[in-house]
Protein backbone atom coordinates (compact mmCIF):
# COMPACT_ATOMS: atom_id res chain seq x y z
CA UNK A 1 0.00 0.00 0.00
CA UNK A 2 2.82 2.40 0.88
CA UNK A 3 4.66 1.69 -2.37
CA UNK A 4 1.56 2.65 -4.38
CA UNK A 5 1.31 5.93 -2.45
CA UNK A 6 5.03 6.60 -2.99
CA UNK A 7 4.62 5.89 -6.71
CA UNK A 8 1.71 8.36 -6.97
CA UNK A 9 3.75 11.00 -5.13
CA UNK A 10 6.66 10.45 -7.51
CA UNK A 11 4.37 10.77 -10.54
CA UNK A 12 2.74 13.86 -9.03
CA UNK A 13 6.18 15.47 -8.59
CA UNK A 14 7.05 14.75 -12.24
CA UNK A 15 3.71 16.23 -13.33
CA UNK A 16 4.39 19.38 -11.31
CA UNK A 17 7.68 19.73 -13.19
CA UNK A 18 5.75 19.76 -16.47
CA UNK A 19 6.17 16.13 -17.51
CA UNK A 20 3.16 14.24 -18.89
CA UNK A 21 2.76 11.13 -16.74
CA UNK A 22 -0.73 10.05 -17.84
CA UNK A 23 -1.48 9.35 -21.52
CA UNK A 24 -3.89 12.07 -22.66
CA UNK A 25 -3.10 14.22 -19.63
CA UNK A 26 -0.96 16.76 -21.47
CA UNK A 27 -1.15 20.18 -19.84
CA UNK A 28 -2.14 18.99 -16.36
CA UNK A 29 -0.09 20.54 -13.55
CA UNK A 30 -0.52 17.59 -11.17
CA UNK A 31 -1.14 13.85 -11.36
CA UNK A 32 -4.79 14.31 -10.45
CA UNK A 33 -5.26 17.08 -13.03
CA UNK A 34 -3.71 14.89 -15.74
CA UNK A 35 -5.98 11.99 -14.79
CA UNK A 36 -9.05 14.24 -15.08
CA UNK A 37 -7.90 15.67 -18.42
CA UNK A 38 -7.26 12.21 -19.84
CA UNK A 39 -10.64 10.96 -18.67
CA UNK A 40 -12.45 13.98 -20.14
CA UNK A 41 -10.66 13.73 -23.47
CA UNK A 42 -11.41 10.04 -23.72
CA UNK A 43 -15.03 10.56 -22.78
CA UNK A 44 -15.42 13.42 -25.28
CA UNK A 45 -14.45 11.22 -28.21
CA UNK A 46 -16.53 8.34 -26.96
CA UNK A 47 -19.59 10.55 -26.46
CA UNK A 48 -19.41 11.69 -30.09
CA UNK A 49 -18.98 8.08 -31.16
CA UNK A 50 -22.06 7.09 -29.15
CA UNK A 51 -24.10 9.91 -30.70
CA UNK A 52 -23.18 8.94 -34.24
CA UNK A 53 -22.77 5.21 -33.75
CA UNK A 54 -19.64 3.37 -34.79
CA UNK A 55 -20.48 3.52 -38.50
CA UNK A 56 -21.32 7.22 -38.43
CA UNK A 57 -18.13 8.03 -36.54
CA UNK A 58 -16.07 6.11 -39.09
CA UNK A 59 -17.95 7.79 -41.94
CA UNK A 60 -17.26 11.22 -40.45
CA UNK A 61 -13.52 10.54 -40.59
CA UNK A 62 -13.77 9.23 -44.14
CA UNK A 63 -15.77 12.27 -45.25
CA UNK A 64 -13.14 14.64 -43.88
CA UNK A 65 -10.48 13.00 -46.00
CA UNK A 66 -12.74 12.92 -49.05
CA UNK A 67 -13.52 16.63 -48.76
CA UNK A 68 -9.83 17.47 -48.59
CA UNK A 69 -9.18 15.22 -51.57
CA UNK A 70 -11.91 16.98 -53.55
CA UNK A 71 -10.47 20.40 -52.67
CA UNK A 72 -6.94 19.51 -53.72
CA UNK A 73 -7.63 17.12 -56.52
CA UNK A 74 -6.22 13.63 -56.75
CA UNK A 75 -2.67 14.66 -57.68
CA UNK A 76 -2.30 17.10 -54.80
CA UNK A 77 -3.69 14.60 -52.33
CA UNK A 78 -1.25 11.93 -53.52
CA UNK A 79 1.66 14.38 -53.41
CA UNK A 80 0.77 15.35 -49.85
CA UNK A 81 0.66 11.65 -48.94
CA UNK A 82 4.18 11.18 -50.32
CA UNK A 83 5.44 14.04 -48.19
CA UNK A 84 3.65 12.77 -45.08
CA UNK A 85 4.99 9.27 -45.63
CA UNK A 86 8.55 10.58 -45.39
CA UNK A 87 8.08 12.13 -41.95
CA UNK A 88 9.71 10.58 -38.89
CA UNK A 89 9.56 11.36 -35.17
CA UNK A 90 12.44 13.83 -35.42
CA UNK A 91 12.07 15.21 -38.97
CA UNK A 92 9.19 16.49 -41.07
CA UNK A 93 8.46 15.01 -44.48
CA UNK A 94 9.74 18.20 -46.10
CA UNK A 95 13.07 18.01 -44.27
CA UNK A 96 13.58 14.35 -45.20
CA UNK A 97 12.60 14.96 -48.83
CA UNK A 98 15.14 17.79 -49.02
CA UNK A 99 17.90 15.69 -47.40
CA UNK A 100 17.28 12.73 -49.68
CA UNK A 101 16.77 14.80 -52.84
CA UNK A 102 13.15 13.75 -53.34
CA UNK A 103 11.07 16.28 -55.33
CA UNK A 104 7.77 17.22 -53.74
CA UNK A 105 5.67 19.54 -55.91
CA UNK A 106 3.85 21.64 -53.31
CA UNK A 107 2.10 23.64 -56.04
CA UNK A 108 -0.20 20.62 -56.32
CA UNK A 109 -1.32 21.22 -52.70
CA UNK A 110 -3.22 24.36 -53.69
CA UNK A 111 -6.95 24.20 -53.15
CA UNK A 112 -8.91 24.36 -56.39
From Swiss-Prot:
Which residue windows does the record flag with biased composition (Polar residues)? 44-53
The transmembrane segments are none
GO biological process annotation, one example: response to abscisic acid
Disulfide bridge map: none
Q: What induces it?
A: Down-regulated by drought in 30 days after fertilization seeds. Not regulated by drought in leaves, cotyledons, hypocotyls and roots.
* Tissue note: In seeds, expressed in the embryonic axis and in the cotyledons. Not detected in leaves, stems or roots.
Q: Where does this protein have compositionally biased stretches of type Basic and acidic residues?
A: 7-17, 32-42, 56-82
Q: Which InterPro entries match?
A: LEA_5, Sm_Hydphi_plant_seed_CS, Small_hydrophilic_seed_prot
Database matches in Pfam families: LEA_5
Q: Locate the region Disordered.
A: 1-112
Q: Which family does it belong to?
A: Belongs to the small hydrophilic plant seed protein family.
**Any idea what this protein is called?**
Protein SLE1
Q: Which organism is it from?
A: Glycine max
Amino acid sequence: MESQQANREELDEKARQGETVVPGGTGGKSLEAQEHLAEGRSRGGQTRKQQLGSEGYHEMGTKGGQTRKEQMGREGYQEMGRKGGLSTMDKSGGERAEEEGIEIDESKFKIT
